[in-house]
């Protein structure tokens, strides 16, 4: 299948012949007739003119799962975040639902014995994720379940796809594996499959496979602008891929952190191929990208406040340098202000409690 994505960047638009778009004239306001502090004086007026809101409806809680029973495993690099066995997951999710958080995202930390060169455990119909999805949808049918589509938790080398003899990730061969993984999630009952692998063409391939299999209501959240960031370290500890990846990197498929226009091309392609939502990852260091994506496309735009962002905030808070609650709320509000519709954040549960107060 061939997909056509068409858009012009703001820079390109400025060079379109006969473009009649004119810049908006600045307001003419002067002191003392205008005193900007007047509207900031009282809490009621600050609230009345607040431009951006953060509610539990904007929150998605990423959750890590492991095999076994009675497991709540702490993650040293991510304070207060745990890996859950399925029985403990059900207890934790009951609290999430009670707090009004609309969706969770599942990330597996599979046993080392289940890993392989091709990551075939990823599409095992009785795999960890697939069993978790079935159990969750049975008990919490209204909760949105998002599943990660990528091979890195399941490969012995820690890459997101299938590699050749030189360690290079093979794009088109990997697509077949991603299709099988996404279909296994949809068949288990996942509401949203979220390809985070950054292979070219994977959104179109997965969308076509879902349609052909009758999963017409399964949504796709595309990790469209996923950067080869240094902020992912604690996450890789959580899913057990750090040791597998070793000194390797993902620069041949994740985006260069220096690039901005490239993100718009990635988003345009994913939307053309059938993505329902797009994502920018990481969050706060990439708010310029969030704003550009939202302004350019107006599509549902999600942001992942990643493990490194969470770890930095928590480290500063634990040392008494920052107020944990205040910076958690501020960071998420800033992501919303940049244009995010929803945010995957490890602060979701804590912030939901704060918002309830």
Walk through the language-model features, giving the residues of each:
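An N-cap/entry alpha-helix motif that binds or orients negatively charged groups
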Residues: 17, 22-87
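Alpha/beta enzyme core
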Residues: 58-60, 67-357
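Ala/Thr-enriched low-complexity intrinsically disordered regions
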Residues: 5, 9-11, 20-25
């Amino acid at each position: 299948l061939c997909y056509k994505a068409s858009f012009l960047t703001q820079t390109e638009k400025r060079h379109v012949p006969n473009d009649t778009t004119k810049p908006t004239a600045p307001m003419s306001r002067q002191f003392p007739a205008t005193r900007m502090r007047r509207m900031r004086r009282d809490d009621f007026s600050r609230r009345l003119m607040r431009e951006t809101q953060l509610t539990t409806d904007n929150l998605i809680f990423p959750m890590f799962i492991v095999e076994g029973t009675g497991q709540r495993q702490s993650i040293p690099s991510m304070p207060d975040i745990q890996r859950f066995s399925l029985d403990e997951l059900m207890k934790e999710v009951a609290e999430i639902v009670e707090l009004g958080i609309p969706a969770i995202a599942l990330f597996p930390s599979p046993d080392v014995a289940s890993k392989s060169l091709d990551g075939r455990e990823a599409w095992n119909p009785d795999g960890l994720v697939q069993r978790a999805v079935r159990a969750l949808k049975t008990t919490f049918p209204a909760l949105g379940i998002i599943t990660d589509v990528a091979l890195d938790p399941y490969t012995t080398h820690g890459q997101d796809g299938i590699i050749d003899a030189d360690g290079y990730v093979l794009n088109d061969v990997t697509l077949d594996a991603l299709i099988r993984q996404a279909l296994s999630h949809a068949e288990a009952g996942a509401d949203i499959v979220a390809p985070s692998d950054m292979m070219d063409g994977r959104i179109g391939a997965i969308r076509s496979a879902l349609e052909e299999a009758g999963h017409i209501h399964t949504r796709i959240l595309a990790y469209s602008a996923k950067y080869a960031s240094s902020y992912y370290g604690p996450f890789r500890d959580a899913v057990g891929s750090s040791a597998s990846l070793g000194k390797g990197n993902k620069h041949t498929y994740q985006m260069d952190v220096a690039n901005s226009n490239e993100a718009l091309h990635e988003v345009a392609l994913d939307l053309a191929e059938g993505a329902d939502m797009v994502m920018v990852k990481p969050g706060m260091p990439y708010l310029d990208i969030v704003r550009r994506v939202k302004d350019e496309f107006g599509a549902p735009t999600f942001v992942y406040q990643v493990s490194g962002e969470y770890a930095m905030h928590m480290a500063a808070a634990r040392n008494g340098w920052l107020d944990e609650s205040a910076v958690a709320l501020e960071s998420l509000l800033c992501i919303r202000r940049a244009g995010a519709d929803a945010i995957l954040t490890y602060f979701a549960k804590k912030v939901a409690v704060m918002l309830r107060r």
